[in-house]
């Protein structure tokens, strides 16, 4: 499996489907308040994936590499296997487009993620800009 494919499959594909993108910006941005927090695919238990510690939250040790989960905190987005810097957040027609610089233990890559806050407080993650269904995520901690 190639490095780019590995990053997609294990780094972000485990909780945040994304696709490789070109350079979008240079200054890191803080994600909007509606996106901040620990997110988990709705069919999973927050208590089995996250460990709250005061005002912060982290992944339970040992980390479940396959958990469909991510944490957005300030200018950072973390999955069980990747840590990303949010370069920019741009509004799309019905979703936010996040340009990310991500790193795993084996590679670093530029990635784009498509997410949208929903009226019911959940978040939908989209595979690309043509995905109309999305995958719902619940907020475990803010």
Residue ranges, per PLM feature:
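Bacterial N-terminal signal peptides
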Residues: 11-21
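Bacterial N-terminal signal peptides that target proteins for export
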Residues: 2-13
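N-terminal helix-cap/turn-to-beta initiation motif at the start of protein domains
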Residues: 26-40, 69-72
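Contiguous, well-ordered beta-strand patches that form the walls/edges
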Residues: 69-119
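Short, solvent-exposed loop/hinge segments that bridge or flank secondary-structure elements
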Residues: 40-75, 79
């Amino acid at each position: 499996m190639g490095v780019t494919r590995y990053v997609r499959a294990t780094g972000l594909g485990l909780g945040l489907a994304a696709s490789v993108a070109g350079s979008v910006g240079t200054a890191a941005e803080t994600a909007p308040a509606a996106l901040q927090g620990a997110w988990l695919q709705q069919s999973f238990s927050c208590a089995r994936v996250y460990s709250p510690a005061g005002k912060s939250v982290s992944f339970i040790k040992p980390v479940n590499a396959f958990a469909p989960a991510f944490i957005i905190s300030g200018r950072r987005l973390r999955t069980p296997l990747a840590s990303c810097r949010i370069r920019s957040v741009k509004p799309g027609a019905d979703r936010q487009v996040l340009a990310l610089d991500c790193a795993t233990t084996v590679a670093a890559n530029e990635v784009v993620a498509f997410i949208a806050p929903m009226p019911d407080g959940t978040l939908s993650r989209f595979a690309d800009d043509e995905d109309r269904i999305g995958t719902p995520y619940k907020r475990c901690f803010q």
